[in-house]
Amino acid sequence: MIIEVCSQNRALKEVTNIQTGELVSVISIVSSDEKGVEFDCKENLCGVLHLKFNDLEKEYDEEGIPYGRPLPKSKDLNGLKEFVVQLDCDRLIVHCYEGTSRSAAAASAIWKFRGGSDTILTHQRFAPNRLAYILACKELGITPGNQPVPTVR
């Protein structure tokens, strides 16, 4: 399976252009105060998991000023394991707004959970949000590691 990490805009385009015969699933990650992304229902779209959590790793910035938004919590990733265990597709699109940190964190945890045999396709910088990665690993029942995730551009 290919795990594709991308931005929200690219995910919408990719789902619109699913090739005939290709089976695709999506994990859609938005901030906690945003409306979820709607994907046009296509017969090749196997499923969509909607997750909502902010792209934060700590509560305060370097000067001690609070960000004013809640940190991701374990409950924000509820349903991830059930969704991943049931995957039966050629490609899993994992997106967040920019496609670099929350989606990279989820994709890294999924890659590790599935034994590291999938290909991770990226379109830009790959910088997993560390807190989101730890929470995703916890939801998947695996131990987070510092193992680098091989990516393909």
Describe the predicted segments one by one.
Residues 25-27, 47-51:
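Hydrophobic/aromatic beta-strand patches that form the interior of the parallel beta-sheet core
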Residues 42-44:
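Short, conserved loop/helix-junction motifs that constitute active-site signature segments
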Residues 49-93:
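Helix-loop module immediately N-terminal to the HCX5R catalytic loop
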